[in-house]
Every structure is written in C-alpha cells, then in structure tokens.
A protein has these predicted regions:
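Short His/Asp/Glu-rich catalytic/ion-coordination signatures at enzyme active sites or charged loops
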Residues: 32-46, 94-112, 136-172, 227-263, ...
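C-terminal, non-catalytic "cap/extension" segments appended to globular domains
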Residues: 25-45, 49, 210, 214, ...
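Active-site-proximal, well-structured secondary-structure segments within enzyme catalytic domains
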Residues: 145, 149-151, 171, 179-185, ...
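Intrinsically disordered or highly flexible coil/loop and linker segments, enriched in small
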Residues: 56, 60, 64-71, 86-99, ...
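N-terminal helix-rich structural modules
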Residues: 25-209, 645
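Short pre-active-site segment immediately N-terminal to the catalytic Zn-binding motif
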Residues: 470-485
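Classical eukaryotic N-terminal signal peptides for Sec-dependent ER targeting/secretion
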Residues: 1-11
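N-terminal signal peptide
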Residues: 11-26
Length: 697
C-alpha cells in the first residue's frame, strides 16, 4: 500500500506540474548584473548595526505598503521582495549563532535573528498589511512566476494566523511563535555547547584496544587519553573499539547530550505546536507541517514510513543475524545462542564483517581520505558535474581562521551554456561559498549547509556555508566523504538556484521541503563512483591512488547495512511524526516514552535502557518538526533522478547540464514536481527506490 500511496501522490503532482511547466517555462527570471559581496567577518557592533538597519529598512517598506496602496500585484510583490531582502541578514545571523567562537557574538547573532523572526511573524499577523496585500483577490499578475509568488504570499498570511478573528487571538499566535523560536534556539545551542568526555590512562590497553595508535596519540595529554562526544571521536570508537564497555560508555554520553534541559524544552515546544495547530484549525501539528509538502498529509507520511519499514524488515533481520554470528564468536558463545546487536555494537561488527566477507579493510580505506584531498575531489567533481569553476580566496574576513572561502564561476566564463546568468556575460563570480569544516568548542556539532545570503537578480549574489566536523589531520572515514558530497550538493543547489531570481523567496534551496534532500542524496552516489574516487583518493604515506580492488570491495560492502540503516531512519521519522500527531497536553505524556514505544516497533536495535536520552539530542525535532520522513521521500526521488546518469555516465555533459538547469537552477520558482517532469519527462518511478531498498544499485 505504501508504494501505491507514494506513487499516486507523486504521479498526481507531476501530472499537474506538466501543465504548469508549459505555462511557466523552465528558466528563472532573466538576470541583471549582481552587486558585490559583503564581508562575513563582523564584530558585535557591526552585526548589531546591520541587524538594526535591516529591521528599520523592512519596517519602512511595510509602512509604505500600509500607507499607499500598490498600483498592482507586481508593485506589491516588488515591495514585499524588498522586505525579504532586508530581512535576509537573519540567515547570516543564524549561521553565526551556531559557529562563531565568541560567546558574545553568538548571543548577539541569536538576538538578531530572533528579532527578525519576531518582526516577520508580527508582519504576517498585521491586518492592515494583509488587507493591502490581499486587495487584488484573484487578479492575475504580469507573469506566471509573479502569480506563484503572490499565491505564496497569501498562503504565508493564512499559515501565520491572519484569519484569526480578533486582535487578541492574533497576539496570542504571535506569542506562541516567538516562544517556539526562542526555545528551538535554546535546544540547538545546548547541543552545541554540551560536549561530554571520557578519560582513561594511556596505558589502559583493554579499554583502548582496536583504536588507531595515531588517534590515541592525538587524544593523549600527560598520560591521559580524553575522548569527546564530537563526531570524529565517536565514529572512530564505534567502528574500531574492541571494548564493548568503551563503545557503550561513549554511546551513553553521546545520546544523553542536552539532557535534562532539552527534555523540558522539547515538552514545551510540543505543547506550543499543538496549541498553534488547534488555534489555526488543524487536528495536530503534523497536519499543519505536511500540508505544504509534496506528500500532502500526515497520514500519507505515516503510510509511507511504515511501508518502507515493512519492506526492509526481513533484510534488516538478516543483516543483524550475520553480525550476531560474529558477536557470538567474539564472546565464545554457541551457534544460535541468544545475543543482541546493540546500537553501539552495529558499526564495530559491521566493520568486521565487511573486512571478512567483502575484503574491505576500513582502516586501510581511511588512509586514502584526508580532508585536503577529499575537498579537492569534491570541488573537482562539482565543477565537472555542474559546469562550474571554483577560485580560492584568501584575506577575506570570516568568523574563524579555519574557514575557507571560494568564489564560484560558470565554467565557460559566461553561464555554462544554460541561459541567462548573473555573471552578466563578463565572467564574474556567480556566488561565494564558505567551508567551516573542522570541530571546535561551542560549534554546531552536525553537518549542514547554511545560507549567508540568497541570490537576488541585480541585488546580491548567493553565498552559502558548509559546516561539518571533519578531522583536520588524520584519516577521514568514507562515510564522512559521503557526507561531504551530500552537503556540498545543498551548497551547489543554493548557488545555482540563486541565479537570476527576481523573487528572493524562490532563490536557492527553495523547493518543497520534502524535495530538498533529493539532489544531495543523489550526489552521495558520486562518493562510490570509481572515476570520481580515483581522481583524488591517494594514500597518505605513499601517494599511490586508491586500488581498484579496494574500490570494488567498497562498492560491494556499501550494500550491507542498508536495510538496518533504513529501518533506523524510519524510526526517526516515526518519532518525528508521532510526537507531532499526539496530544502532548494529556496527563502522563512523555516524549521519551513515545520514543521507546516506537523503538520497539521500528528500531532495528534493542532498547538501551535508561542511560540515554535520545530525544534530548534529536536536533531535527526543532528544525524539521514532524517531517523527518523527508529524507526517505527524497531518496525515492534521488534514485529516480539518478537513472539518466546511470544510462549516460556520471559526467555526461548533456545529462549533467540538463540536470543543473532543469532541476537546480529554477530554485523554488517552480513546484518540485515540475522540476522532476522537466528532467525525467515522466513521473518518477518508485522502481529505483525499491531496487535500492532491496540492496540493488
């Protein structure tokens, strides 16, 4: 049933989109020359002035709309676009709040973007502003893209609560939104600052068994080894640590980050979201959150995630049993003796199995991936695939000395063969990217792409930042290389989709949220491509290129664990969904109890007892709320989009250029279903996802 639901939703959307595509055209608004960059290196007074100026400018534009009725839809939208551009500093402030090393700067940045969010919420609850904006009713705009922007404007008013009957109710909606914003920020910042550690003597051979000597040496001070809950540390311990007690300890520390404070924060956020949904007439917050996504309803999301979980259940059990055999042998147990593969066991025994059954030596493999060669490989692959050129910039002020800066150009010096360009035909930059790639104290702990500025034709170039926690020195895991490709995909979507956009709302990664991950998930396949890896993966000691035999082993072994990983993703999706479908105000509601209940039904791992607090560090509950399902929904789309590349070649110029210009470059100017139809020529089949879930390529 899940495939039928997913197929019917996608087919319906794409069928509608085919008509809209003809009406709208597949190119963004024609470009005009863009203005210069702003420096990303700012201090507290500079940021505060910039933020105050943005609010002052936006307020003056809004006042002008209230004071004088726009002559038509296009004039209204131009004024609203000016407000959007002015408020764009909030995105940059949000980035700084997550990555800046100075606490005072992080606090100022937080204050800035919260103030901007609160201003925007008040604006879309302002009846006078709404009445000016809605005065045109069903009148047509000058073109299809302007019409789409106008429809989005009215939708934003509706979803903000403008239809509430009284000023008192609208004021209450404002207070709910403001409190959610503040609590979500507190949740995220608590995670960023909550780094936990484990220490032991450097000569504790039993505890440190299996860990790379170089890793141990790098973590030793005065005879004491200190391991943190930062991802590079925990990843290494889970994969190579022979001590189950060490793995369990690190898992417990990592999965308890944020607790107990974030447990109380989450409870309050869930209560506020429930109240928000009830206030606006939705049965629950999940219904509100999914209404503007491709999937359409929370019930469709529930059916989809349950179906994916069911189809992978048998394969996940088979994968787990293969690991149980290794653990039994490790523990000296008889064949068939009951034994569990705990969550902190999986990576260790999977690494052992891949070595034994697929001839994949993970330690050997990691020596072919260092940050610098991985970076050059990703840049080279992106340049070929998206027909771009990257130039390193030095001397550009940033928030930290480790941040790398690149300007982005069309490869041809014009627009790469794809039509109008903000380069203005002069070969100038079309955007800028920042790479903040290594762990440090109080920095965002995960991997993500952040907006610095959205591209707006004739106003500003797109700027984006990739934030990760990869090791600066020492080997990288192949999984980290895959993450590099994934997040760089978002960065390229932001830059390419920011070209020629008249309306800021449509710039960059601006499609429906459950399409957003698809381009990046597709790009993960390049991290397994032999031509791509052979172009940069060289041994850190000898400089020899990665052997084809090792690459073949990597590709064979990559299939193992897919079912378990997918079921775990569906567990996360169900936690995300169910926490927002259930009433958190009923007596006895407990988010941790809900997560435990769902773990029993969906997680491939047994319960870990009371020594972890997963929901306290499930950061997606803040940003994604009910829609974590989007990762697997996007995977279905990614696998469909990958098929033309498999037929023509991963770097086929025609296919890659069509993909760049038909899928990425429109940004949000067209519905995601239109982008799919324009590239594939038909509704995407779920057959590719089905094969992928079954372990095929």
């Amino acid at each position: 049933m899940w495939m039928a639901v997913a197929a019917s939703v996608i087919t319906f959307l794409v069928t509608l989109a085919a008509t809209e595509l003809v009406e709208a055209g597949s190119s963004p608004v024609a470009a005009t020359p863009a203005l210069t960059f702003e420096d990303a290196g700012v201090d507290v007074p500079t940021l505060s002035r910039r933020c105050d100026k943005a609010l002052e400018t936006a307020r003056s534009f809004a006042d002008a709309i209230r004071a004088t009725a726009p002559a038509g839809i296009d004039e209204l939208l131009t004024r609203v676009n000016d407000i959007d551009v002015a408020l764009g500093v909030g995105a940059f402030a949000s980035l700084l709040s997550e990555v800046h090393p100075d606490e005072k700067m992080r606090d100022a940045a937080t204050s800035c973007y919260l103030g901007i969010d609160q201003f925007a919420t008040r604006l879309y609850l302002d009846r006078a502003f709404y009445e000016r904006s809605a005065a045109f009713g069903t009148a047509a705009a000058a073109d299809r893209l302007a019409q789409r922007r106008y429809e989005k404007l009215l939708e934003d008013f509706e979803r903000s609560g403008i239809g509430l009957a009284t000023a008192e109710l609208r004021g209450h909606a404002q207070s709910i939104s403001d409190e959610i914003d503040e609590l979500s920020t507190n949740f995220s910042h608590k995670l960023a600052s909550d780094t936990r550690t484990f220490s032991c003597a450097a000569d504790d051979a039993d505890t440190l068994a299996g860990l790379d000597p170089a890793f141990v040496a790098a973590h030793t001070t005065d005879g004491v080894v200190t391991i943190t809950t930062d991802y590079p540390d925990t990843t290494h311990v889970y994969k190579y640590g022979r001590s189950a007690e060490l793995r369990r300890t690190m898992y417990g520390l990592s999965r308890s980050r944020g607790a107990p404070e974030n447990l109380a924060t989450l409870q309050r956020v869930l209560e506020l979201r429930w109240e928000w949904a009830q206030l606006l007439g939705w049965p629950h917050y999940a219904a509100y959150a999914t209404a503007t996504k491709m999937i359409g309803t929370a019930e469709h999301a529930d059916t989809f995630t349950r179906g994916v979980a069911n189809i992978t259940a048998a394969a996940a059990e088979e994968e787990t049993e293969r690991l149980r055999r290794l653990k039994r042998a490790d523990l000296g147990l008889a064949e068939g003796a009951p034994v569990d593969i705990e969550a902190y066991d999986w990576s260790y025994y999977a690494t052992q199995l891949r070595a034994r059954e697929y001839a994949l030596n993970a330690t050997e493999l990691s020596h072919y991936f260092r940050y610098e060669n991985a970076r050059e490989g990703v840049l080279r692959a992106a340049a070929r695939l998206f027909h771009l050129r990257f130039e390193r910039r030095t001397g550009v002020p940033t928030w930290h000395e480790a941040v790398e800066v690149y300007d982005v150009f069309w490869a041809s010096g014009g627009d790469g063969g794809g039509g109008d360009s903000d380069a203005g035909g002069g070969g100038g930059p079309i955007g800028r990217i920042y790479l903040d790639m290594h762990p440090r104290a109080d920095k965002y702990k995960h991997a993500a792409q952040f907006t610095v500025r959205d591209g707006v034709a004739g106003v500003q170039l797109p700027e984006g930042c990739l934030v990760t926690n990869f090791p600066l020195e020492g080997p990288m895991e192949h999984s980290q290389v895959t993450t590099f490709f994934h997040e760089f995909g978002h960065l390229m979507h932001h830059v390419v989709g920011g070209q020629g956009q008249r309306w800021k709302l449509f710039s960059g990664v601006a499609t429906e949220w459950d399409f957003v991950e698809a381009p990046s998930q597709m790009l993960e396949e390049w991290a397994l491509d032999e031509e791509t890896l052979r172009s940069f993966a060289t041994h850190d000691a000898t400089g020899a290129p990665i052997p084809r035999e090792l690459l073949a082993a990597l590709r064979r072994a990559a299939v193992f664990g897919r079912a378990v990983s997918t079921r775990q993703q569906m567990y996360y999706a169900q936690v995300s969904l169910q926490l927002h479908m259930r009433d958190p105000t009923v007596p006895g509601f407990d988010a941790e109890a809900v997560a435990a209940e769902l773990a029993a039904a969906f997680s491939p791992y047994p319960p870990v007892g009371g020594f972890t607090h997963f929901v306290a560090n499930f950061g997606h509950l803040m940003g994604y709320s009910a829609i974590y399902y989007t990762y697997m929904w996007s995977e279905a789309i990614a696998q469909a989009m990958l098929q033309p590349f498999k037929r023509a070649g991963f770097y086929d110029p025609s296919t890659s250029l069509r993909y760049r210009d038909l899928v990425l470059r429109p940004g949000g100017a067209l519905p995601a279903a239109s982008l799919l139809y324009s590239f594939l020529g038909e509704p995407p089949s779920l057959d590719a996802l089905h094969r992928w879930l079954r372990g095929g390529e």
